[in-house]
Amino acid sequence: PDELSVLPNVSEVVTDKRELPDMLSRFGVVDIPTGISEFGNRHRAYVKVQDGCLLRCSYCIIPHVRPDLTSRPQEQIFDEIRRLVDNGYREIVLTGIHLGHYGVDWNWDKPKEKWVRLATLVRQIAEIPGDFRIRLSSIEATEVTRELVAVMAEYPQKICPHLHICLQSGSDEILRRMKRRWSTRTFINRCNLVRENLDYPSFTTDVIVGFPGETEEYFQQTIETVKEAGFSKIHIFPFSARRGTPAADFPEQLSKKEKQARGRELAGVEQQLRKQYFDQLVGKQLRVLVESPLSSEKSVVSSAPS
């Protein structure tokens, strides 16, 4: 900061974002517009509604550097979405470090009947007038609640029947080492809950292959779990040790060759699952979002709600 402050034309150096409002007020900026109104030449916009994570999974550095849960005020979110819809955006993606914990930081001292949850926010957004659809970004299995699924079922034209539910491993033993807070059976049960209430929902996920201590048996358990879940897409990540996380110092680290081999095997399974999912949509009518025309053909690139 000291080196930056002496550079030509530098008036202030902000070392803590919490100081920003006070600093700007010294320059006469007292009302700062929040949110984003444009995302370039796109039809999809991203609205961050939450920050921070408390879970402390053994492989993740985020809770160590951003531990404080912060939910964005609802009116700010609604105003931003209205601006985006007015500017022509037709899909609004709600994002957050731990999206499913939206409202948790407000609920500590409130009776349960007054809690604000993600389902509360999604319902309120779905009731905003306009021709747009809502998509949720990454969410944890235990946050796929009956309340949230009920809201998704109530607004099928507004809320995409798609959930990105983080699995990370399909082995209960590896989940325990990862310090995940649920079992594979809980995960599958939440997927089944969604299937029972929504038409042709799709599930995507993240999986880490080659986590320390992952034997061939544990890896095959992951294969079986992803098959049972029926994902339409899997983001596959070979385990990479993050300095400062417990998993970086775990014994039984796997070789790069083993991790790559397991990644390839899982990718093959993903291709099969992806085909199975899209095969069931053949002949179905879906309302899609047109992304762009294909210049060489009389067709367009579009994205389905799922």
What are these regions (language model features)?
Residues E217-E224:
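Short, acidic/polar
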Residues P1-D105, R117, L163, R185-E196, ...:
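Proteins enriched for Cys/Gly/acidic motifs involved in redox and nucleic-acid/cofactor modification
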Residues S5-N9, V30, K110-K112, M152-E154, ...:
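Short, hinge-like loop/turn segments at secondary-structure boundaries
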